[in-house]
């Protein structure tokens, strides 16, 4: 499956989602590895098998095996970190912020790909998962590494588009009526 095949599964009410998905492969503000790694990391973050499989199939020809694994690792490690650090940030009892996390996350320090790419994928996943503390941390690393605000915004936009595709598929499968075109 590919982005084109994924688009054929989207309902009529998701016309804008289809158009946004169509634009993803033409995104030119990111490197090929950054863009296609985003597709994989964000695809798995949706927890929608159809979306994840389609985006991995689209991305695989553009990524090394190490980059493909790193993109999946970004989705996986951020799933853990985003829950934990969102809790410590949102909890009224600030004592939780002082306790050691006791979470193994060595992949962040040694992701097997360019650290900037892994950070970019982690930022987009963190945005999808709604963890402000992680968003701020990854954005700071990316800005220090020289990425522009436009590149960072692009990564989050890619995540938003992918999230919308997953919701559209689920809404259609849940019997939501299609909007008139």
Curated annotation (Swiss-Prot):
Disulfide bridge positions per record: 131-134
Reactions catalysed, as given in the entry: N(6)-[(R)-dihydrolipoyl]-L-lysyl-[lipoyl-carrier protein] + a hydroperoxide = N(6)-[(R)-lipoyl]-L-lysyl-[lipoyl-carrier protein] + an alcohol + H2O
Listed EC numbers: 1.11.1.28
Residues at the catalytic site: 131 (proton donor), 134 (cysteine sulfenic acid (-soh) intermediate)
Top-level taxon in the UniProt lineage: Bacteria
Transmembrane regions: none
InterPro entries with a match to the protein in the record: AhpD, AhpD-like, AhpD_core, CMD-like
Biological role stated in the UniProt entry: Antioxidant protein with alkyl hydroperoxidase activity. Required for the reduction of the AhpC active site cysteine residues and for the regeneration of the AhpC enzyme activity.
HAMAP family: AhpD
Record's protein name: Alkyl hydroperoxide reductase AhpD
The encoding gene: ahpD
């Amino acid at each position: 499956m590919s982005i084109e095949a994924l688009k054929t599964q989207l309902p009529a009410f998701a016309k804008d989602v289809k158009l946004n998905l169509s634009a993803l492969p033409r995104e030119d503000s990111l490197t090929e590895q950054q863009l296609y790694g985003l597709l994989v990391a964000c695809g798995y973050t949706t927890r929608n098998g159809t979306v994840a499989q389609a985006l991995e199939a689209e991305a695989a020809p553009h990524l090394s095996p190490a980059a493909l694994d790193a993109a999946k690792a970004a989705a996986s490690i951020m799933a853990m970190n985003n829950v934990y650090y969102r809790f410590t940030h949102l909890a009224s009892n600030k004592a939780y912020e002082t306790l050691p996390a006791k979470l193994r996350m060595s992949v962040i320090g040694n992701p097997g790909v360019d650290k900037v790419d892994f950070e970019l994928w982690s930022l987009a996943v963190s945005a999808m998962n709604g963890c402000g503390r992680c968003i701020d941390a990854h954005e700071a690393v990316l800005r220090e590494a020289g990425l522009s605000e436009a590149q960072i915004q692009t990564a989050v936009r890619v995540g938003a588009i992918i999230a919308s595709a997953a919701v559209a598929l689920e809404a259609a499968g849940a019997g939501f009526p299609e909007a008139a075109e």
